[in-house]
Design a protein with these regions (language model features):
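Amphipathic alpha-helical repeat scaffolds of TPR domains
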Residues: 2-21, 44-72, 95, 107-125, ...
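Charged alpha-helical initiation segments
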Residues: 2-15, 217-340, 498-502
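Structural signature of alpha-solenoid helical repeat scaffolds
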Residues: 4, 44, 75, 103-106, ...
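Helix-turn-helix repeat elements of alpha-solenoid scaffolds
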Residues: 20-40, 73-101, 126-139, 171-181
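Short coil/linker segments at helix-helix boundaries
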Residues: 63-83, 163-177, 319-327
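Long, charged low-complexity segments
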Residues: 243-279, 381-447
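Short non-catalytic regulatory patches outside canonical folded cores
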Residues: 325-423, 432-433
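Amphipathic, Lys/Arg-enriched alpha-helical patches that create a basic surface
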Residues: 420-426, 444-513
Length: 513
């Protein structure tokens, strides 16, 4: 019997829908718990396993929405961790099933419906913990398939994102949000639920109140933005040019510019993001801008070095006459692979740089030699947690810490982002042990059997992890800016007239060497 015809599963799905209609949190929680337990009998049958987890995930999500009012408790955090586990495990199981199984058109329709639903709700979950760029990145991929709910939810995410944005992109983000929401309203009720449409319309109504607001006065329309990305079929090999670099940056959403979260078209002036106004003493007026300059420069340099290492296949003169032994396992050596590693290390170092910034900005009191991105969250009495309630951007940084260092309240490490945790593992091996990169072009012949000292990884996986690491750093940098802006607005909202603004001019490109 096909998994999508399983009567037991269909019956549980019906019960979950009925419990939601009745707003019965106890039944939703019981269904979620029961199906999570039942799913363990089907781990080898990937779609049955995913289907059980899908119903468990949606039931638990609905339970949280109905039952849990206080989002600053350990109980809420444990429930979110469990939801993340159910969603991520279901998505991974479906991805593996699609990779290993040939399916017919009917099965694809059923699978695609479940996959889109899980991914959409997963992105909504990321929004609830402050990881806006991550959520938008994943939701945008769904929206390019013209899935109506994803288009509408992407619109709400961009709307919320714009509310936090203090840069010149704010109005453009609102316009793109409007277009997405308006597009979602054109779908039939069977595709976009009437309740969802009402919610989308409420956002549109808010935007319609803005004076002189023309939502369709944008450089690109939503239809062109949601086309399949060009990078899928683009070959950058031996083509290291300014134009190609910025194409790569834009289409991987790596620019320090909030518009790049929705708009993947390459532009000039990509990296325009900087800190907002900060209240500080006149004798210390530029310190935070100075450290942010350093964070930003290191990010942009690491990003380019990664690109160059990935796409420059030319031999470099510095590799000539460097005698190496052929170990018969197809390793990769040379300046380009070392560029990728260097970019990886440099990007990873930004976590601690950001931790140093937060320690000084929030006056957490950690000694300079003890500060790290990990340690600023570890003290139970740490003042940084007092800021959480009114600063969702800071909460997004906290959840990145949880994924990176496998820190959970429930002690269930299966809820963490496996790719980010893998990023952490590879960095530690690269830094403290012995990482051997095997050539993905010869993956069938490559083997680690001949080298029991090495921890091996393919060049393709290292590149993929490198891009993901850069993207996570980008999100943290944006969240850092939002965190500061939210905090400055909270502490200054009643006393703005008492302060004098001091202008800081741009550091010219001509001065950079």
């Amino acid at each position: 019997m096909k998994w999508y015809k399983n009567e037991q599963l269909l019956n549980y799905a019906k019960k979950a829908d009925e419990a939601l209609d009745k707003k019965d949190p106890n039944s939703l929680y019981e269904i979620s718990e029961k199906l999570e337990k039942l799913s363990t009998d089907y781990v080898e049958s990937k779609m049955m396993y995913a289907y059980y987890l899908y119903i468990s995930f949606t039931s638990l999500n609905n339970y949280i929405d109905i039952k849990v009012n206080n989002k600053e408790t350990v109980e809420w955090e444990k429930l979110i961790e469990k939801s993340l586990f159910l969603a991520r495990t279901a998505i991974n199981s479906m991805d593996e099933y699609l990779k290993d199984t040939e399916i017919d058109e009917i099965e694809y329709i059923y699978l695609n419906g479940i996959y889109n639903s899980v991914k959409t709700n997963y992105c909504n979950l990321l929004i609830s913990i402050g990881k806006y760029s991550s959520a938008i990145f994943e939701m945008r991929k769904l929206a390019t398939s013209q899935f109506g709910m994803a288009i509408g939810n992407l619109g709400t995410e961009i709307f919320d994102y714009a509310c936090f944005d203090y840069t010149d992109n704010k109005e453009s983000l609102y316009k793109y949000a409007y277009q997405l929401l308006d597009t979602a309203l054109t779908y039939e009720d069977s595709i976009v639920h009437p309740n969802a449409k009402a919610f989308y319309q409420s956002k549109i109504d808010i935007l319609d109140e803005i004076d002189n607001f023309n939502p369709y006065d944008t450089e690109y329309n939503v239809e062109s933005i949601l086309k399949k990305d060009r990078l899928d079929n683009y070959n950058f090999t031996n083509n290291i040019t300014n134009e190609d670099y910025w194409d790569w940056v834009a289409e991987n959403s790596l620019a320090l510019n909030t518009i790049n979260d929705i708009d993947y078209m390459a532009k000039n002036n990509q990296d325009t993001l900087h800190l907002p106004n900060i209240l500080t003493s006149i004798n210390n007026h530029s310190s935070f801008y100075g450290i942010f300059n350093q964070i930003k420069q290191e990010y942009c340099s690491a990003r380019y070095i990664l690109y160059e290492g990935m796409y420059n296949n030319k031999n470099h003169f510095s590799d000539e006459n460097v005698y190496l032994v052929n170990t018969i396992d197809y390793p990769k050596y040379g300046l380009n692979i070392e560029r990728v590693k260097a970019a990886y290390r440099s990007a990873y170092a930004l976590f601690d740089r950001i931790g140093y910034f937060l320690n000084k900005y929030f006056k957490l009191g950690l000694k300079d030699r003890e500060v790290s991105f990990k340690k600023i969250w570890q003290s139970a009495n740490n003042e940084i947690y007092e800021v959480f309630e009114n600063n969702i951007a800071l909460k997004g940084m906290y959840w990145t810490y949880k994924d990176l260092f496998a820190k959970t309240k429930s002690k269930n490490l299966d809820c963490i982002d496996k790719k980010l945790r893998r990023t952490y593992t590879i960095r530690n091996i690269m830094e403290h042990r012995y990482l051997k990169v095997l050539d993905s072009n010869f993956i069938d012949q490559a083997t680690s059997d001949y080298d029991n000292l090495a921890y091996t990884i393919t060049s393709d996986e290292l590149n993929e992890l490198g891009i993901n690491l850069i993207r996570i750093c980008r999100e943290l940098i944006i969240l850092l800016c939002f965190t500061v802006n939210i905090n400055e607005n909270n502490i200054n909202k009643d006393e703005k007239d008492k302060f004098v603004t001091m202008a800081l001019r741009e550091f010219s490109d001509e001065w950079k060497i």
